[in-house]
Curated annotation (Swiss-Prot):
It is found in: Cytoplasm. GTP binds at residues 21-28, 85-89, 139-142. GO terms for biological process: ribosome disassembly. The keyword Nucleotide-binding applies. InterPro entries: EFG_II, EFG_III, EFG_III/V, EFG_IV, EFG_V, EFG_V-like, EFTu-like_2, G_TR_CS. Catalyzes the GTP-dependent ribosomal translocation step during translation elongation. During this step, the ribosome changes from the pre-translocational (PRE) to the post-translocational (POST) state as the newly formed A-site-bound peptidyl-tRNA and P-site-bound deacylated tRNA move to the P and E sites, respectively. Catalyzes the coordinated movement of the two tRNA molecules, the mRNA and conformational changes in the ribosome. Keywords: Cytoplasm, Elongation factor, GTP-binding, Nucleotide-binding, Protein biosynthesis. SMART domains: EFG_C, EFG_IV. Residues 12-286 form the tr-type G domain. GO terms for molecular function: GTP binding; GTPase activity; translation elongation factor activity. Belongs to the TRAFAC class translation factor GTPase superfamily. Classic translation factor GTPase family. EF-G/EF-2 subfamily. It comes from Thermosipho melanesiensis (strain DSM 12029 / CIP 104789 / BI429). The lineage of its organism: Bacteria, Thermotogati, Thermotogota, Thermotogae, Thermotogales. This is Elongation factor G.
Length: 691
């Protein structure tokens, strides 16, 4: 095993890349082979038998899908490559977003038999958002139905990308025998099963015509992007391979083209040329535009990738670790940092000490003495740092652009099975929500239940699974819940009189009050209109308190009441018997009496839902929304996609992630936030109240 830690390469020889793909395109296998050929692994792991290095959580080994982006470092031809493995399942897009934010480039892996699949579109859109340069790998060329030309065309059609093949396959399915390098115009074959012996040879006669035609296409596409090549191409001059690579690198870095490679990671064919492509076409930290940040005066500053600049880094992932507690992954953008030194968390305004710095190799770790600009590293010792926080030098405080995380869209109640589980639960939930900003946990004051919220049903399933496995906490899972409210529709007046005479000191409180409906965004307002001291000043706060407490439990179904203004009009008091308690009780009596006359109604949370879908699924999606009592507000276009905005009651949205996935073959995505509370239709309200 080569030691990585001693090798600090020049910045231009560093690559920070992600590997992104649809769930079954063979991404983890591709990563595995990269680790094998770069000498980081002695035996080849396989997802099918659960020995893949990157999929190191137990759930991943069982489900065969990648959930956590593990960061790994390896060497290839005196370059260092840091790889972030990203999940391909739609419930984990937060992991993909967070990885893309700290990467410089990416390999997009496609299944050559399926071409662009639904999640590939989602991930591609996320990569577009962060302007991440990409190269593509058409994997599974040995699979039945593998069709390189179809797969490349699907990139143009579905992703609106500009794919430029730099290789073509020799054969496909079970006759797949190697690849042709269209720049060098050589055939590449692998001689052994493990794919370590690779030879370049002349192109076999039967593939020559096709290879020449594809090289011509490559030059034509490059000529459109590069003036120098255009001139030489039109003049019929010989264009050198060096010039082709230079022009293609520039086009890739500007996101104007995507070089396409092919092979079969599982059959150990095509991975080494793909690694060469990472060095050839993907950016080093020096090729990236400077990162923007803001200093303590709120002025924008540029953070340059230079180890002589002050230290600046972005924490992009927290991982709860059973052995060391908490690992904080961060990307260093400038400067250098020694282990044992202090960093300033400018987001929180706190200083923290880093006890250890670690380069991660999937689930193994190597301690290092220092890190510098360009590195992706894990640290131990940062207690207060959360995902998205900036770490920097106290002498030059800077805050980098925050990461945006979507609001959770599904909630369920959980309860511990035993008292022992209860004690462990809150600690475990705190650790898990530190680790994953799209996961929330809180105790509902109204019901006393522990509620967990996340990005989808699979997301919460895995959280519950992790509670059991990693934290030995067993929980029972309830049905998804909705937080209803109540309000009044018309003004009403009532009198509240509380008198008790039973020997000794009595109780006396008397109020006359009016209650009016106000905007539902306001919970409660209080106005005192008492004149001439008919109720002494010291009892007025008790009147307000009495109404506030009574409003916590509504008349119809016991839900909290909102949108009410209470006006104290009149009343009376007793020199000896009046007390704060008596006025509190009198006020709550007046409130309960008035609410009955004020036409109380039930309110429900209404969500603002935004759905992004390819056009062909729009009709089905809108029909389904209508069946959920939705009000469609607008339909917009973004390229070949349609954006549907609608208001939908939360109670109608349970199971929506799964339904939308099946209506659009997984190609549509949605976000959902609370828009307002609105009156529940009478028929539905009757059903809820009768429960």
């Amino acid at each position: 095993m080569k030691e990585i830690q001693a090798i600090y390469v020049d910045l231009k020889k560093l690559r920070n890349i992600g590997i992104m793909a649809h769930i079954d395109a063979g991404k983890t296998t591709t990563t595995e082979r990269i680790l094998f050929y770069t000498g980081r692994k002695h035996n080849i792991g396989s997802v099918d038998d659960g020995t893949a290095t990157m999929d190191w959580m137990v759930q991943e080994k069982e489900r065969g899908i990648t959930i956590v982006s593990a960061a790994t470092t390896c060497m290839w031809k005196d370059h260092r490559i840091n790889i972030i493995d990203t999940p391909g399942h739609v419930d984990f897009t937060i992991e993909v977003e967070r990885a893309l934010r700290v990467l410089d480039g990416a390999i997009a892996v496609f299944d050559a038999a399926a071409g662009v699949e639904p999640q590939s579109e989602t991930v591609w859109r996320q990569a577009d958002k962060y302007n991440v340069p990409r190269i593509a790998f058409m994997n599974k060329m040995d699979k039945i139905g593998a069709d390189f030309d179809m797969a490349v065309k699907s990139m143009e059609k579905k992703l609106k990308a500009n794919p430029i093949p730099v290789q073509m396959p020799m054969g496909a399915e079970d006759s797949f025998e190697g690849v042709i390098d269209l720049i060098e115009m050589k055939a590449i074959r692998w001689l052994d099963v493990e794919g370590t012996e690779m030879v370049y040879e002349e192109i076999p006669e039967k593939y020559l015509a096709k290879a020449e035609e594809m090289r011509e296409d490559l030059l034509e596409k490059l000529a459109e992007l590069d003036d120098e090549i255009m001139e030489m191409y039109l003049e019929g001059e010989e264009i050198s391979n060096e010039l082709i690579k230079k022009a293609l690198r520039e086009a890739t870095l500007e996101n104007k083209a995507t070089p396409v490679f092919c092979g079969s990671a599982k059959m150990n064919r095509g991975v080494q040329p793909l690694l060469d492509g990472v060095l050839e076409y993907l950016p080093s930290p020096l090729d990236m535009p400077p990162v923007k940040g803001w200093n303590s005066d709120g002025e924008e500053i540029e953070v340059l990738p230079d180890e002589n600049e002050p230290f600046t880094a972005l924490a992009f992932k927290i991982q709860a670790d059973p052995y060391v507690g908490k690992l904080t992954f961060f990307r260093v953008y400038s400067g250098r940092l020694e282990k044992g030194s202090y960093v300033y968390n400018s987001t929180k305004g706190k200083k923290e000490r880093i006890s250890r710095l670690i380069f991660m190799h999937a689930d193994k770790r190597e301690d290092v003495e220092y890190v510098r600009a360009g590195d992706i590293v894990a640290a131990i010792g940062l207690k207060d740092t959360k995902t998205g926080d900036t770490l920097c030098d106290e002498k030059r405080p800077v805050i980098l652009e925050k990461m945006e995380f979507p609001e959770p869209v599904i909630s369920i109640a959980i309860e511990p099975e035993t008292k022992k589980d209860q004690d462990k639960l809150s600690k475990a939930l705190t650790l898990l929500s530190d680790e994953d900003p799209s996961f929330r946990a809180y105790v509902d004051n109204e019901t006393g239940e522990t509620i967990i919220s996340g990005m989808g049903e699979l997301h919460l399933e895995i959280i519950v699974d992790r509670l059991k496995r990693e934290f030995n906490t067993n929980v029972r899972v309830g049905q998804p819940q909705v937080a209803y409210r109540e309000t009044i529709q018309v003004p009403a007046e009532a009198e509240g009189k509380y008198i008790r005479q039973s020997g000794g000191r009595g109780q006396y409180g008397h109020v006359v009050m009016r209650f009016e409906p106000i905007d539902l965004s306001k919970t409660f307002e209080f106005e005192d209109r008492i004149v001439g001291g008919v109720i002494p000043k010291e009892y007025i706060p008790a009147v307000e308190e009495g109404v506030r407490e009574a409003a916590q439990s509504g008349y119809l179904s016991g839900y909290p009441m909102v949108g009410i203004k209470a006006i104290l009009l009149d009343g009376s008091y007793h020199e000896v018997d009046s007390s704060e308690m008596a006025f509190k009780i009198a006020a709550s009596m007046a409130f309960k009496e008035a609410v009955k006359k004020a036409q109380p109604v039930l309110l429900e949370p209404v969500m603002s839902v935004e759905i992004t879908t390819p056009e062909e699924y729009m009709g089905n999606i809108i029909a389904d929304l209508n069946s959920r009592r939705a009000h469609v507000e607008s339909l917009d276009s973004r390229g070949h996609l349609r954006i549907i905005k609608a208001l939908v009651p939360l109670s109608e949205m349970f199971g929506y992630a799964t339904d939308l996935r099946s209506q659009s073959q997984g190609r549509a995505t949605y976000t959902m936030v609370l828009a307002k509370y609105a009156k529940v239709p009478d028929k539905i309200a009757e059903r809820i109240i009768s429960k």
